């Protein structure tokens, strides 16, 4: 819970009783008026999804968890650089804004995140935000321009991130139906973790 930002993130545990979740939701509505709440849970748990749908919550696509399990390929990564001062402005201009972890928040938490860039002809053409402070570090975002994607710079970003992350483990969560994205991570050495899909739902609590 981040009171100053009126934001709540909740990973919902196991429950098969809709009444139990409805009671918890009522508690949050009474005590956190005006907050935006993101909930992550098993997409097949109707005891949780049912009450949220009735309240008009916004459902994101189902997510597939992938874990690095195999060696990454040996490819050229000369175009990949860590974020440094000359590239900050371009990185911020390119970065997704419809997310909690905006470029500005990433920059203010560099003890928690590593940022790698695709640099070609003096221009930032892609970036990867990944955790750096855990035994299993999560990739938060990978973005490429169309040109960088066609050149295969996404795989180069992943290979370099994996090298810098050693000896720690790495994971990522992608849309379950994103075939091209899943293929990219598979090529880098990731495999799907079956039975661990999740879904994120955003619910704006009335003030």
Enumerate the predicted regions with their spans.
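Conserved donor-binding loop and adjoining core beta-sheet/short helix segment
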Residues: 1-32, 120, 125-146
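Conserved acetyl-CoA-binding loop-helix of GNAT-fold acetyltransferases
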Residues: 17-30, 144, 150-163, 183, ...
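Hydrophobic alpha-helical segments and helix pairs
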Residues: 24-74
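Conserved beta-strand-loop-alpha-helix junction that forms the acyl-donor binding cleft
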Residues: 38-48, 171-183, 198-205
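Conserved active-site tyrosine of GNAT-family acetyltransferases
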Residues: 50-53, 184-186, 190
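Conserved catalytic-core motifs of GNAT/GCN5-like acyltransferases
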Residues: 58-70, 173, 191-206
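Short amphipathic alpha-helix that is part of the acyltransferase structural core
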Residues: 63-64, 70-101
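Active-site rim helix/loop that mediates acceptor-substrate recognition in acyltransferases
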Residues: 95-124
